[in-house]
Design a protein with these regions (language model features):
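Substrate-positioning beta->alpha
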Residues: 6-28, 36
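Residue-level signal for the nucleotide or nucleotide-sugar donor/cofactor binding architecture
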Residues: 12-18, 46, 107, 121
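Conserved C-terminal active-site "lid" loop/helix of NAD(P)H-dependent oxidoreductases
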Residues: 17, 53, 76-117
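Generic structural signal for individual residues within well-ordered alpha-helical segments
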Residues: 21, 52, 113, 124-128
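Mid/C-terminal beta-alpha module of Rossmann-like enzyme folds, strongest
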Residues: 26-91, 127-131, 137-149
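Conserved catalytic loops of nucleotide-sugar-dependent glycosyltransferases that act on lipid-linked
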Residues: 2-8, 12, 97-100
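Residues that recognize and position ribonucleotide moieties
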Residues: 3, 13, 44, 66, ...
Length: 149
């Protein structure tokens, strides 16, 4: 289940892994000397509301439109922190995760986008491909499984 915290106007910078791989390949093919540091981000940055729209479209599911105020989200997060402390279990919801969710996290990728690199996939296409892989496609016993937090 999903519950929107806040108005959803906070913006998030994201990158599709296929584009990151293509960018690294592009840089390796240039074979430039020296050290070059890049922040890879696919643009445009999306608001949480627009990101939910992409997810709804990709999964063909309606996400509940109920929104709770940020202060109530924090309160719930602190409640889960206390439960986690008492039970000594790590829970999926915490005050830290609420804080990250409602924050704007935007990064500057001007250097990447002025380097001549053209991403092979739009951010929306990358999100669609990722969501399909993670939540729609059938899995076999031979598929590798990666666990994250």
């Amino acid at each position: 289940k999903f519950l929107m915290i806040g108005k959803g106007q906070n913006r998030k910078s994201m990158a599709y892994v296929g584009n990151v791989v293509a960018f690294i390949k592009h840089r390796l093919e240039l074979a430039e000397e020296g050290y070059h540091v890049f922040n890879y981000i696919d643009k445009p940055d999306l608001t949480m509301t627009s990101l939910l729209g992409v997810i709804e479209k990709s999964l063909n599911k309606k996400i509940p439109s109920v929104r709770i105020p940020i202060w109530l989200g924090y309160l719930g997060g602190f409640g889960f922190d206390m439960i986690a402390f008492v039970t000594r279990k790590k829970l999926a919801i915490s005050s830290v995760r609420v804080k990250k969710f409602v924050a704007t996290t935007q990064f500057d990728a001007t250097k990447v986008h002025s380097s001549g690199f053209k991403a092979p996939h739009s951010l929306e296409e990358g999100l669609d491909r990722t969501l399909n892989y993670e939540f729609v496609q059938e899995r076999s016993e031979d598929d590798e499984v990666f666990y994250t937090e």
